[in-house]
A protein has these predicted regions:
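Juxtamembrane intracellular "pre-TM" segments in multi-pass secondary transporters
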Residues: 1-3, 191-221, 254, 427-428
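C-terminal ends and interior cores of transmembrane alpha-helices
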Residues: 83-98, 303-321
Length: 428
């Protein structure tokens, strides 16, 4: 009997990521309005605290929620996660005008719990769904990454439009979307899951043993470094550098989107990037699903360096030398195409490792949230300091360093896997 399509879950994931991207925009606009009309001075430090509250909650709870999904079944978490998100955006509508920060911090903690419940459950579910089909696994994980990146990009656009049209009631629109996402999770087909019944101490011992396995232990620094690149290039830092009025004849990208229609031009550039990145993910999903995971990840590091060379050339092309873009832009696209293979390959690799601990699949896949969160915090923090010292070049320098660290660990892992395969082949 053929299995039902996993499309409802991927659609639900896309909607959740739309809400994630839109909520960041709408919340920022809401806080700006709150400062203007309520007379309460909300600073950049306060906004940073809200982000820290969300990430700290998600990072600390994701493994625990993944372990619970192993014991109780993933469907509960797939459905309850979006419902908690619905509650979170609804509560924002009731933010007090006097001293709103403690209330908003609590609301962000609720958002972190929602994400911690949902992401490990989705990845554990997809690993269960593709347990006996490696080629399907690569395709499904690529589609998950496409739903994630595409949803966030669409959400950023939707957030601004929703705020302009509906004001505070944009949060009500987000609540409706959370409800639709929960319905999609309900429609996701049932899949075979090995339910964990042992006590938490035994689970903890197994988890620590899994973490210390060379396949995963060597891989962790590489993935954190690549996730840090997302914190550098897919955060407000790059928007700030491109949009801030700044004239530097030696770095033409600094302030290149400032001035009239700068926001529109920036949206077109970022939108074009996300569209191309999504098309690259589709390619990796349907045409190269039989390429070894580690080889794809090594190819992605090559792509990072190609993109860095292109960005350096664009940034230092010199005034009036726009003709050189004919060389640098295609090179940049080649780099983006190659580097886009890392995320789906890494997710498929992590799912492969989970086959060795099928009972703890949700707990293990919860590492995705930890890697992504730690990496983004690292990229945002270091990116700000590098950009302060060296401008746009600083982001390129940091990217080169992080990619080099990732390359070292991937080569170590590649060598170990090759040796293990040789031993297996010799022993039969």
């Amino acid at each position: 009997m053929p299995r039902r399509s996993v499309a409802p879950l991927l659609i639900g994931t896309f909607i959740l990521r739309v809400n994630s991207g839109a909520a960041n925009v709408v919340l920022g606009l809401f806080l700006a309005q709150l400062t203007t009309h309520a007379g309460y001075a909300i600073t950049s430090f306060h906004v940073g605290l809200l982000a820290v509250a969300f990430f700290a909650t998600e990072l600390s709870l994701a493994p625990f929620m993944g372990a619970l999904s192993d014991r109780w079944g993933r469907r509960y978490f797939l459905i309850i996660g979006p419902l908690l998100g619905l509650m979170q955006v609804t509560f924002i509508l009731f933010t007090p005008m006097r001293n709103p920060l403690p209330y908003l911090l609590w609301v962000q903690v609720l958002a972190g719990i929602s994400s911690a419940m949902q992401v490990p459950a989705v990845l554990g579910y997809l690993a269960d769904y593709t347990a006996h089909d490696p080629s399907l696994r690569m395709r499904v994980m690529s589609l998950f990454e496409l739903a994630t990146s595409g949803g966030i990009a669409a959400g950023v656009v939707l957030g601004g439009i929703a705020w302009d049209r509906f004001g505070h009631f944009a949060f009500a629109l987000l609540a409706v979307l959370y409800l639709v996402a929960a319905a999609c999770m309900i429609l996701a087909p049932k899949t075979r899951q090995i339910i964990e019944r042992s006590n938490f101490r035994a689970v903890g011992r197994r988890y620590w043993r899994i973490i210390r396995t060379p396949r995963l232990f060597i891989f962790i620094p590489a993935w954190i470094c690549i996730c840090a690149l997302a914190g550098i290039w897919l955060s407000s830092q790059i928007t700030f550098i491109l949009s801030r009025p700044h004239n530097d004849p030696h770095q033409l990208l600094m302030g290149s989107m400032a001035g009239p229609d700068g926001g529109h031009r920036l949206s077109l550039v970022l939108g074009g990037y996300v569209l191309f990145f999504g098309l690259c993910l589709l390619f990796w999903a349907f045409f190269l699903n039989r390429v070894p995971r580690l080889r794809l990840m090594l190819i992605s590091i090559t792509g990072v360096y190609i993109a860095c060379i292109a960005l350096e050339g664009i940034n230092h092309r010199g005034i009036g030398n726009d003709a050189s873009l004919v060389i640098w832009m295609p090179l940049l696209l080649v780099g983006i195409f190659a580097e886009s293979s890392f995320a789906p390959a890494a997710l498929a690799y992590l799912a492969d490792i989970s086959e060795e601990a099928a009972k703890d699949r949700g707990l293990l896949m919860g590492l995705y949230s930890i890697f992504l969160g730690v990496g983004q915090l690292l990229g945002n923090g270091l990116g700000g300091e590098f950009a302060r010292i060296w401008g746009f070049d600083g982001l390129i320098y940091l990217t080169v360093v992080l990619a080099f660290v990732a390359l070292i660990f991937l080569l170590m892992l590649f060598r170990r896997e090759k040796e293990a395969f040789g031993i297996y082949k010799n022993t039969g």
